[in-house]
Amino acid sequence: MDSYFSAKNSTLAGDMNATWPASHGFNATGDPPSMSITRLFPALLECFGIVLCGYIAGRANIITSTQAKGLGNFVSRFALPALLFKNMVVLNFSNVDWAFLYSVLIGKASVFFIVCVLTLLVASPESRFSKAGLFPIFATQSNDFALGYPIVEALYQSTYPEYLQYIYLVAPISLMMLNPIGFIFCEIQKSKDTQNASQNKAKIVGLGFLRVLQNPIVFMVFVGIAFNFILDKKIPVYMENFLDGLANSFSGSALFYLGLTMVGKIRRLKKSAFVVLTLLITAKLLVLPLLCREMVELLDKGDSVVNHTSLSNYAFLYGVFPVAPGVAIFATQFNMEVEIITSGMVISTFVSAPIMYVSAWLLTFPTMDAKPLAYAIQNVSFDISIISLVSLIWSLSILLLSKKYKQLPHMLTANLLIAQTIVCAGMMIWNFVKEKNFVGQILVFVLLYSSLYSTYLWTGLLAVSLFLLKKRESVQLPVGIIIISGWGIPALLVGVLLITGKHNGDSIDSAFFYGKEQMITTAVTLFCSILIAGVSLMCMNRTTQAGHYEGFGQSQNHKPVEPGSTAFEENPAPTNEPELFPSSIPETSCCSCSLGNGELRCPSIEPVTNSSASGPMPSSFEKTDHCVSRCDSQSCILAQEEEQYLQSGDPQLTRHVLLCLLLIIGLFANLSSCLWWLFNHETGRLYVELQFFCAVFNFGQGFISFGIFGLDKHLIILPFKRRLEFLWNNKEAAADRESPVSEEIKMTCQQFVHYHRDLCIRNIVRERRCGAKTSAGTFCGCDLVNWLIEVGLASDRGEAVIYGDRLVQGGVIQHITNEYEFRDEYLFYRFLQKSPEQSPPARTLRDHQEESYKEIGHSSPPSVSPKT
């Protein structure tokens, strides 16, 4: 947090205070604020808490993606239309400020056309029109109803309740006027892709407008306006309760569905996608709010100065609302730019929360005096530090319990998290240090700023480490030097500052404790870290052979196996990347998976006809399995390989790249703050908001780390899910002691054994050595998931995992050491011997089933990577 507040610059503060009139958007008159800030944080907690619950439900596979479609249909086809119809019927158009509406519309149109033109100029010819159609919609369409309305209601319900109705007017107007242009571009791209250049231009335009009319938001707005005049702004009693029931169900279900749709959206992104995402999110969350606010300032000349200022502030907050999920639906319908749009929707949703909080805080602040603002920033920093400290302790515990801190790059990430933890603790201690306690201030300052500079520097060092990890077949990663630099250089800088700097004893702000010298030191540290991180990430992109990053939790570069660590010999890999599981069996790896383009891929599931040692198992599988008892994890080679994979097989490069990019954004904000203070004494409203943003970033970095590393699927989410299921099953078992396995699981297992088991064994089971003289017929969890999807027993990977878990509970399959539940990962499982009651039915039915499998196998697409 780099602030200008100090007694040394009191004259500057006075001049600054004189240049901030009410027209700048702040309440500088001492009048009551135009919005209720006390209700904002509970509203944000409510909205994002429900979103998080939905995300956890999807991540833990409690609700699969197929099941989530039902909730999505209810939200879009019943709850939202009822909400729109109800509010459009009772809307009083005589109270609407139409100047405000067209000002916001002009602001959105400006961003739309800027993004569209720049995309047409820069994008490659192959996908120019699809990008020019979807990117402007992404930058202008907000999540007005699910996220926007609860926040506007919390802020303005008690002061300007009429502002709530603008939500229902701005969204459909922009949809009707801007979205058709984007749809027309997408139809043009669709025509080019199908090589149908002769398609009628009028038909393309008509299809664009037809998609708009099919949108339930637009359709129900027209119907609601018509009934507004027919019913004279009053809903009949017999309809009111029915509409209320549907409309009231929208908010919670829509937010929960939003969380469900976020699972697995950040997937394989091309090397330029992160740059595109950064630009689009900047346009949506920064450029759009500023333009909307300035348009209202220029065009809406109301009679009341207070109301005019409040409307301009409202326009800014409206622009900060995150991207609507509907944009991802449009991208999926056209099958264009799906990865960028869906990933951007997820990121913008969570980035918008702190921006909304900071903006609303500033817009309601009663005065622009320097001293109260400095205390306000201190209070915000203290509050955020408390919550961030808890998040960081949780994230560090995850790294320790999962033992990921022993591997790279998590070892370096742990150092970053420790530095962030010390920053939060230092800020909390600084808040209690007396201003007259010089020694105490010096000691806490050293603790606070040596760790803060360390977080700045660790961003660059982590990016360098990621680049070196990509190149480590030719470059050895100097871990010791990096760790010493990450802690030693910041300590050295603070020591030099203590010796050469001039202490400002009257400052209550730690960011200006040593005045100009401290600002220069901070700026140099930030610039160096940004430069190092930026260059490293660009070089890392250039060295990525496949031209894409992998999704969260997926492996992209694996730690090489040390010689002699297992009894298997290393085979030549098709790329320069080391193999995850080396094998002595020449024709296949131990996991039936191969490395291609730097990533693990499971092969397509089809019958193998070779007669190698690792060939497919015969249907009489039980007779050839020599290791039928549970393996000892201490001696079983396969179990040792699993342990090696779990500890070092997933460096989570995409998570680390995303962490670096988000931290670089905060570093840019801090650098801008320093340079603004050093070279421009004409501070203004944007500068003050920049200070709050810097405070939120510096002491809230723990939220970023928690979001990326704190929700470990297998260490947190799935065990919590299993614990709930255990407690629930205990209650059911108390009522029925004789049925430990549910009838549903029994039925699933019986059907699988009777109709699918033998064919599944022939397709995916491979015989692998598990000891010096023993072998076992095993398969990977991801192999079974792929097979279940291809033969139609599951519609997606989530349902396939549920199916596999039922087979484990029913005793059909088992993990080789019986230590893990069924996972969509490279873990080894075996089929258990058939029990006497599992005898198959007539052979003719099985033959018919196999015939249908063969037809599916010939037409099935290549398998996809496992979901983690």
From Swiss-Prot:
Where in this protein does the record put region GPCR?
378-715
**Residues annotated as region Disordered?**
550-582, 836-868
GO CC terms:
lysosomal membrane
Tell me the compartments it is located in.
Lysosome membrane
Annotated membrane topology = Multi-pass membrane protein
Name the tissues where it is expressed: Widely expressed in adult tissues and during development. In brain, widely distributed in forebrain regions, while it shows a more restricted distribution in the midbrain and hindbrain regions. Expressed at highest level in the lateral part of striatum and hippocampus.
Where do the segments described as PIN-like transporter lie?
Answer: 1-368
What's the protein here called?
A: Lysosomal cholesterol signaling protein
Give the stretches traversing the membrane: 37-57, 78-98, 103-123, 132-152, 166-186, 212-232, 242-262, 272-292, 314-334, 345-365, 380-400, 413-433, 437-457, 479-499, 519-539, 659-679, 690-710
Fill in the domain comment.
Cholesterol binds at the interface between the PIN-like transporter region and the GPCR domain; these two regions likely coordinate to sense cholesterol and regulate mTORC1 activation.
The record lists glycosylation at 9, 17, 27, 307, 379
Residue spans, topological domain Lumenal: 1-36, 99-102, 153-165, 233-241, 293-313, 366-379, 434-436, 500-518, 680-689
Q: Which gene encodes it?
A: Gpr155
Subunit comment: Homodimer; via the transporter region and DEP domain. Interacts with the GATOR1 complex; preventing interaction between GATOR1 and KICSTOR; interaction is disrupted upon cholesterol starvation.
Answer whether the UniProt record assigns the keyword Transport to this protein: no
